[in-house]
């Protein structure tokens, strides 16, 4: 069954999807994420990694250790490499790490808050550009940034995005919608449209269990399930336009009517790339299927990346998501995954009720918006 969504399609090239699909079948990692640091010059309320005291909980790998892991990743077959944090550009040795990894031939993307894309970093990227920069956008003015991130740097971020585009670097926007910035959603859409930037917007926030093990099922900086659904549908309508929104709403209705709720046991496994064709290495060298499935199982500095990948890949194949989720008629638009189940409930096989509720509200809001559009067209 196709993965029917109401959001605009992602901009990932088809060749990347093909490579990941082939690698998943072969048990080979096509992509890796290196979480270079938990440090950050922002203090975002919804962050699942950084906190003011996070640096006290241990160090981070040296440049030499990250470069060694890069060589091991290349030997494993990794093609796509994402550098993230915290704020990865905050590391003083970032140029050393980045330059060495770039020479290895990886297709490198970088997650950043965008505030440091100037000076030495600008010159580094001018001479040796990454494949893409994923810049987090938290609002459309300095005041929203101050409330949500403790750093009124919106103007600087927009200026730096312009710098990067001027030197020919592809920029994608990541945006997380919270109670602090939900009223900016139309402005965010208009801004990214005016700048000609692709945006990935999400209204679902994972519980920050990596930062606080006691936060299972709870995130103090997220919308209610109903609000998350409302803003999800609102943004979809903004970005798709009425005609495409109506077409997709009709397709969803057909999908629900055809659903027989029969499910094969194989449908309960991990369906995303986590642990199948992708791996995640945290600042200490621990290897996980993804950044949200962070249960320590193997350290790459101690055991080597190849052994850790075999361990993670084998463990991932044993994950079973809830039978209720696999049989649910809303599963094609529900953001529930193995990581979400674990973060929301503490186990892989318990349905995450927050997401169940969000999906039900999403369907309800889609129907209401479609009805409103048709009624207004008929009245007009």
Residue locations for each model-derived region?
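Accessory C-terminal segments flanking Radical SAM cores
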Residues: 25, 33, 197, 214-215, ...
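Conserved alpha-helical substructure of the radical SAM core
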Residues: 2-132, 231
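Radical SAM enzyme [4Fe-4S]-AdoMet core and its adjacent flexible, acidic
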Residues: 131, 136-274, 280-284, 292
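Short histidine/acidic/glycine/proline-rich micro-motifs that form metal-
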Residues: 88, 116, 177-180, 295
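Hydrophobic residues in well-ordered beta-strands that form the structural core
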Residues: 46-48, 110, 173, 201, ...
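Residue-level signal for the nucleotide or nucleotide-sugar donor/cofactor binding architecture
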Residues: 61, 92, 152, 180-183, ...
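Short loop/turn motifs at secondary-structure junctions
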Residues: 43, 77, 129, 169-170, ...
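Short Fe-S-cluster ligation motifs
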Residues: 69-85, 353-380
